[in-house]
Design a protein with these regions (language model features):
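Exposed aromatic-hydrophobic patches
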Residues: 87-96, 642-646
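Exposed beta-strand face motif in extracellular beta-rich ectodomains
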Residues: 99-103
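Active-site and adjacent substrate-binding regions of carbohydrate-active enzymes
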Residues: 2-30, 37, 46, 50, ...
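Short, surface-exposed loop motifs enriched in S/T, G, D/E and P with embedded aromatic residues
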Residues: 69-84, 92
């Protein structure tokens, strides 16, 4: 057997360099390749390390960094390999002279050189966050050394559980009528009471009006379930009074909706979470309010009022800019200092108040962050993001609690992640979309986020490029601290997208093992279905869950979710490690999460595929690989340093390498 095999015979190169992924030099932002003491601050030194497998005949490695707007270069020194390592380390030191320092590596080889598997080696190539490229490239995919204040350390280990409050759990505090529909003392005009087992509408006006009566005390009742999944952070969609059940059209930010139990219920929930060592992430719309919001009503009533400057009126009082021309969602004008004092800036703002007692939220998810502060020639998005980050920092100084700032973003967010504003995003573009494109039911007619087409079915080779390409444009901390979600309250359900239990298990394995914060939308763990974002907001069938009723609950998905998220908690590499791609085929993806304490290999298969033979040739002492988890129809066999990964159907295997 040769030293390195990379899949079935005749597999074409899967990288622009022409070098098989497993034989390529490697660097990433993880702790095995970037070393420094504590949080990196301006002026600190970082040790940068490049791993070159024994299969790759390198001649020299040099650093190219951009410091103070000018290029800095240095030759990397080879350091002795540790016993059992099958490759070479090259190292240098880089000073964080600027808040963000971009860098890459020039990798030279002798003309005509080949790898151990016989692949031609480029004599001249750049190693960037996008991989090995045998020509000159722009700086957009350079690695980045970031010296801004980091995200809270707890985010590295977090698993988020997303709850749409009205559909999660209804406590005994909510009165119901004889037909089981909620019957509060004061029912808003918009609300259409629904029995818990009635199916939500797929689309249409009714979607925002169906009121099931879930409340915050109901969430407290179900914390055991959330904790059993391995989740430690609860993300609530908006809790403020509004003109709809989704509450993204708030009528005030000063109190919690009485339909959910009011301020006292949110304080009770926060306290219950903190008693368990769990955390609370709240949801805020900074781009718009509802048309019934007290600020907007004051603005319409008096064009000379302070509140009139909070909005973008075109013809007062009824002509105004709104989110995507939805009249019920008037857009905020964040050029207004008075608005920012009330909404985003300082301890008295909406952002600041809910971080303090009695709520003590552990962070904010900002709705429509990509449009916040942007309209025509106005763009104050970065100012607002930095300002909110500053409000979180002030709260930390007051309370001692570190808080997380996450931005909703549906496409390429790299331009908004400089490192000093949002800690990360909801990673639809760099995680959800490519995973859907790979795992979607080939016959699916679903679309999402307004795309005027049905979902394509792409090969793993293309999907790996997408995952790597989007990731390459983000600073590593932003990538690690972004939310990875397979579905959310704004999309069809995972199960409806992929079509089968078997492919959903592969999706859960990807969620638990790729870099980023796993975020599970309540109901996905039981195989819930939904054809649109509105239809996906299905009430949780708690009686069926308790009875393990297989007609309503996919117990295999539930068990796999618990096992895989539990494994993530056990393996530090899956939480904090770097990412090294080893192989991509049409129906399989293979990568290693690298960490000084351990390396963990993950193989995902969407369908049956010929055996893939891999010698990872990773750094660290060679040890006997240990299979940590298997789901579906995947097998792994060990023959010395070579792994044989095969699949007769969809599945995944997780292997500890060292």
């Amino acid at each position: 057997m040769t030293d390195l095999l990379v899949g079935p015979p005749g597999l074409p190169p899967v990288d622009d360099s022409g070098v098989p992924l497993a034989e390529q030099p490697h660097h990433d932002g993880g702790p095995r390749h970037v070393r420094h003491e504590g949080a990196l601050r301006l002026g600190d030194h970082a040790v940068l390390r490049v791993w070159v497998p024994a299969a790759y005949p390198v001649r020299a490695v040099a650093l190219r960094a951009m410091v103070d707007g000018e290029i800095l270069t240095a030759t990397l020194e080879e350091e002795p390999a540790s016993p059992g390592e099958r490759g070479r380390w090259f190292t240098t030191t880089l000073v964080a002279a600027n808040p963000v320092v971009g860098y890459r590596f020039c990798v030279l080889a002798d003309p005509g050189a080949v790898t151990a598997s016989g692949a031609p080696v480029p004599a001249y190539a750049w190693l960037t966050a996008a991989g090995l490229v045998p020509w000159d490239v722009a700086d957009a995919t350079d690695f980045r050394l970031v010296a801004h204040d980091p995200a809270p350390e707890w985010v590295d280990d977090a698993v988020v559980y997303q709850v749409f409050p009205d559909r999660f759990s209804r406590s005994a505090r909510v009165p119901v009528d004889a037909e089981g529909r909620p019957a509060p003392a004061e029912l808003p005009d918009w609300a259409v009471p629904m029995a818990w087992d009635e199916e939500p509408a797929v689309r249409g006006d009714l979607t925002g009006r169906q009121y099931y009566g879930g409340d915050l005390d109901g969430v407290i009742d179900r914390l055991d379930h959330i904790a059993s999944l391995g989740a430690d952070t609860l993300y609530l969609t908006p809790v403020f009074p509004a003109g709809s059940v989704h509450r993204y059209d708030a009528s005030t930010f000063d109190r919690v909706d009485p339909l959910l139990g009011g301020d006292e219920a949110l304080a009770r929930l926060s306290a219950a979470l903190h008693e368990r060592g769990m955390r609370l992430l709240l949801d805020l719309t900074t781009n718009h309010t509802g048309a019934t919001h007290e600020w907007f009503r004051a603005a319409q009533a008096d064009p000379a009022s302070e509140e009139a400057g909070f909005y973008l009126f075109t013809d007062h009082p009824d002509g105004y800019v709104s989110w995507l021309d939805v009249a019920s969602l008037p857009k905020l004008d964040l050029r207004s200092d008075a608005l920012r004092d009330r909404l985003t800036r300082g301890p008295g703002s909406v952002v600041g108040r809910y971080l303090d007692s009695p709520i003590e939220a552990d962070g904010w998810r900002i709705d429509v962050a990509n449009m916040t502060g942007r309209h025509r020639d106005v763009d104050v998005t970065h100012e607002v993001a930095r300002e909110i980050r500053g409000t979180l920092r002030e709260a930390q100084e007051r309370t001692g609690r570190e808080t997380w700032l996450i931005a909703e973003h549906g496409h390429d967010a790299s331009g908004d992640l400089a490192g000093d504003g949002w800690h990360g995003t909801m990673n639809y573009a760099g995680f959800t979309r490519p995973l859907w494109a790979w795992l979607a039911d080939p016959g699916s007619s679903l679309n999402w986020l307004g795309l005027p087409m049905t979902l394509p079915s792409l090969p793993g080779t293309a999907v790996r490029r997408t995952l790597a390409g989007y990731g390459a444009h983000l600073p590593w901390p932003s990538r690690l601290h972004s939310q990875n979600q397979l579905s959310s309250h704004d999309t069809p359900r995972t199960r409806s997208v992929v079509g089968t239990r078997e492919r959903q298990l592969v999706a859960v394995a990807a969620l638990a093992t790729l870099p980023g914060v796993p975020t599970l939308f309540a109901g996905d763990e039981i195989g819930a279905e939904g054809l649109t974002g509105e239809h996906s907001r299905t009430p949780m069938p708690w009686d069926a869950i308790a009875a393990e009723d297989v007609t309503a609950v996919d117990t295999a998905v539930l068990a796999a979710t618990r096992a895989l998220l539990g494994l993530r908690r056990e393996e530090v590499a899956l939480r904090r490690g770097g990412l090294r791609w080893l192989h991509a085929g049409a129906d399989s993806l293979t990568f290693v999460r690298t960490h000084p304490d351990s390396d963990v290999l993950v193989h995902l298969a969407r369908d049956a595929h010929p055996p893939v033979l891999l010698d990872p040739q990773g750094p660290g002492p060679a040890g006997a690989p240990a299979v940590r988890a298997v789901v579906g129809a995947v097998t792994a066999e060990v023959d010395g340093p070579v792994l044989r990964l095969a699949a007769t159907g969809p599945g995944a295997v997780v292997i500890a390498l060292s």
